[in-house]
């Protein structure tokens, strides 16, 4: 490898269950830690979700994401617990991504105790990410994204707080942001949201209006 090249290898759990990834330093040219479960019609047919995954005490840097789910999640991703992440010089701190045609689900994800020092985006949850393996996929097969909690996040030198962009006919639901504080060296870009419902508590900068106050939702707490 040339001394100026960035290693592309990272750590991916794909169609895996009962996995623990911990106590690691990673520097890569890809998402540092990612969870996947198959790609479009092939992942739907294989039908093996990633579940029961614990990730903790990870430090690292990447031009992409620190922790990611997707975008290939056609077999489903559920019951994921992530804590104590320390990322610097990132593209995106936390990136949850899927697309029309994927199908599957992303649910019961909890991410907490995250420190970011330098990122284009603190957080992205998006339903329009990733290509398709061929033309045989069904664009009407939509993923379900439900019950994603992100809490106790502190970031500095962040260019834009975050983007949460669901799918018109499959709104991302029960998205909870709690004690999420993101600051920029200058004026930080605001949250941008659409096709999402959920709650927000003690979030800086102020969250988008699509995330109702916790008194209206009841599921999003500190």
Language-model region placement:
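Extracellular/periplasmic carbohydrate-active domains that bind, remodel
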Residues: 1-222
């Amino acid at each position: 490898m040339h001394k100026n090249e960035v290693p592309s290898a990272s750590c991916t759990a794909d169609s895996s269950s009962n996995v623990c990834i911990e106590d690691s330093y990673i520097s890569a040219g890809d998402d540092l830690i990612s969870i996947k479960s198959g790609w479009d019609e092939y992942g739907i047919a294989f039908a093996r979700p990633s579940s029961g995954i614990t990730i903790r005490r990870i430090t690292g840097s990447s031009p992409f994401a620190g922790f990611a789910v997707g975008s290939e999640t056609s077999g489903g991703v559920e019951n994921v617990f992530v804590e104590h992440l320390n990322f610097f010089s990132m593209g995106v701190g936390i990136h949850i991504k899927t697309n029309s045609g994927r199908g599957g689900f992303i649910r019961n994800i909890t991410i907490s105790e995250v420190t970011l020092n330098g990122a284009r985006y603190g957080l992205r949850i998006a339903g329009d990410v990733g290509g398709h393996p061929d033309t045989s996929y069904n664009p009407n097969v939509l993923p379900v994204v439900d019950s994603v909690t992100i809490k106790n996040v502190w970031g500095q030198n962040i260019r834009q707080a975050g983007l949460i962009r669901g799918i018109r006919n499959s709104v991302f639901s029960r998205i909870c942001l709690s004690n999420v504080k993101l600051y920029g060296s200058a004026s930080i870009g605001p949250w941008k949201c659409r096709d999402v419902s959920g709650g927000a508590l003690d979030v800086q900068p102020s969250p988008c209006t699509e995330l109702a106050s916790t008194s209206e939702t009841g599921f999003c707490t500190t």
